[in-house]
Structure formats: C-alpha cells, structure tokens
C-alpha cells in the first residue's frame, strides 16, 4: 500500500536520474532497474556498517507502489533495522521526484523492501562484524 503522508525514512544513500534505456515495453522504468538501485544503495550503507566487503543474501517483500517515468529523480533512502554476527538487515525506500513528467515536483515513495547483506572476508567467507562498526 502506498506510503501516504510519510517522509523518507533513513539516510539518502543513492541518487540518480532515470533514462529511456531503463524502460520496459510500456515506457515505464523496469522494476528490475529500480531493484538494482536499491541493492547498490543498501550495499553502500552495509559496507559502511561492516567496514568492508558485503554481499546481498536476501531481498524480502519488495513492493512497487507506483510507476516511475523517464527523467524522474530516483533517491534511495536506507536505514539499518538490525545486525547479527555477520548480517546486516536494511530497509530501503525509493522516492521519486518528478522533474520531467507531470505532475511536476511531485514527491512520492515508489518502492520499498528489506535487504539482508553479509559481511565477508577476502576469501568470500562470512566474517563477524566488528563491535565498533555496528551503527
């Protein structure tokens, strides 16, 4: 259900502009493209928390609320929900600002999901989070 009367939750971790090459056959931005932006944004926060490499291990309940158009500004907001021994659970929201299509200036939440990342060592094996690295 769309997030009405709500402001973005978390820190802005990624901001980009949609392009025509990111569209599906209907002319809307691909859901997969939006999901990849969320993954990149979430990984940025997870890497900061882990103090090093992380991998995405799970995406829970991604919900797309509204279509995204060419020329829209896409902002990914993230906040850490919890940490485990090596895992970092992050809530991600995608907020859109319409600057090319109508209604101009509209700001809304287009998608939300929970991403889980795991801190890994140089061999790609899970490693414990350092106590000082946990936010």
UniProtKB/Swiss-Prot annotation:
Transmembrane segments: none annotated. PROSITE patterns: HOTDOG_ACOT. Keywords: Hydrolase. Pfam families: 4HBT. One of its GO terms (biological process) is acyl-CoA metabolic process. GO terms for cellular component: cytosol. Gene3D superfamilies: Hotdog Thioesterase. Its EC number is 3.1.2.-. GO terms for molecular function: long-chain fatty acyl-CoA hydrolase activity. Residues 8-123 form the HotDog ACOT-type domain. The keyword Hydrolase applies. SUPFAM superfamilies: Thioesterase/thiol ester dehydrase-isomerase. This is Uncharacterized acyl-CoA thioester hydrolase BUsg_263.
